[in-house]
Amino acid sequence: MAAATDIGTRDVPSQTGKKPWYSILYVQVLIAILIGIVVGWLFPNLATNDWIKALGDGFIKLIKMVIAPIIFCTVVSGIAHIQNASKVGRVGVKALVYFEIVSTFALLLGLIVGNLAPIGHGLAAKPDAAAVANYVKQAEAQKSVDFVLNIIPDSVVGALARGDILQVLLFAILFGFALMALGERGHRLRDIIDDTAHAVFGVIAIVMKAAPVGAFGAMAFTIGKYGPAALGNLIGLIALFYITAGLFVVIVLGLIARFIGFSIFKFVAYIKDELLIVLGTSSSESALPQLMEKLERLGCSKPVVGLVVPTGYSFNLDGTNIYMTLATLFISQALGVDLSFSQQVTILIVAMLTSKGASGVTGAGFITLAATLSVVNPALVPGMAIVFSIDKFMSEVRALTNITGNGIAAVFVSWWEGELDHDLLQRRLNQQIDPSDVETAVTTG
């Protein structure tokens, strides 16, 4: 029997055989989403009840409850287990290089598609600026200097309580280096942190049993509140964004996967549970802990996963990048504001900065859009009201693209570091190891 290192998995013989289809999590979530769509469509008054909405909101809060401790424990543990401090810096630099290159491709793809399919022309929109005033106000915090300063927490306890990913990540990195510097004296504390991570993953396993309920509530409320009629003439933008995000995953991420030696489609199938949870909640953050655990099972290096994935939730949001450039062009077309080539280059540069302040929570993409428009051309800001009503329908695909991109990023950086178990990856993706036959294990001694 092969034991995993630290927080990992081991293969054990199946005692009961295959699970019945109705007990598989992704099947339950998918059924819940479909039921939510039907209830929201046929019974909108019931679906918009506060208690229905609370089902989705409550599930997201349960997940967010454990994100900060998971990030802290995994990052600290990952760094503390590394003997060479320079390796942490090397992994971080490689991750940032990857993030910038892939993010640029995502932004460029949005610009190219937006120019090739100018569906905003002829809309003759007269937006209500008041509808987006709150988002514009929040966008003020996305200025470059403020963004850098906001990474530094006023209080570690406050950062953990708020679940601020970047602030927790900064403290975890510093704490991990300090623990590594202690050498033998720090091993006992390191083991305690490892055990704490196992306990938190146990909490996640309990919370995930409520995933179908949360997905049902979130989807029913969304359809009940907005309904198919809410799409109106903006259905073209939604469809165009879906297609563009799909092209990015298949072409850009697909080529990266093929370069490493696996199929993007098999990878998507491998993380289907996490994708369906994200689809139901429209928040890529809701699947962060499970994604990290699954990437380790896939053969990715634990330290790499612990550093790349949490960082990617602020620095590698591919779906948000596509959305920002595509939506900016759509708004300018709808308002009759022609953007020159130099202005579009400005959009690209500004979006590369403002997107770094986004996090994997619902609505973050809309806030970063406000920040981008405010810098590029303030006259475009009122046009955000045009896409305000349909933002919810695009946030799901943003989140799906974000989580897929971060998963591929962790695999790529692990490969770049020479710490990707290719044999295990192929066996997992080819389903030669059944996920139902795998249990989490703790290495002792």
Curated annotation (Swiss-Prot):
List the PROSITE patterns hit by this protein, alphabetically.
NA_DICARBOXYL_SYMP_2
Recorded GO cellular component terms are: plasma membrane
This protein is called what? C4-dicarboxylate transport protein 2
**GO molecular function per UniProt:** fumarate transmembrane transporter activity; malate:proton symporter activity; succinate transmembrane transporter activity
Record's keyword terms, sorted:
Cell inner membrane, Cell membrane, Membrane, Symport, Transmembrane, Transmembrane helix, Transport
**Source organism (scientific name):** Bradyrhizobium sp. (strain ORS 278)
Q: Which family does it belong to?
A: Belongs to the dicarboxylate/amino acid:cation symporter (DAACS) (TC 2.A.23) family.
Q: Which HAMAP family match?
A: C4_dicarb_transport
Locations listed in the record: Cell inner membrane
Pfam assignment, any one: SDF
| Residue intervals passing through the bilayer | 24-44, 62-82, 96-116, 163-183, 201-221, 237-257, 334-354, 366-386
Biological process terms in GO annotation: L-aspartate transmembrane transport
Q: Which domain of life is it from?
A: Bacteria
What does this protein's UniProt record list under function? Answer: Responsible for the transport of dicarboxylates such as succinate, fumarate, and malate from the periplasm across the membrane.
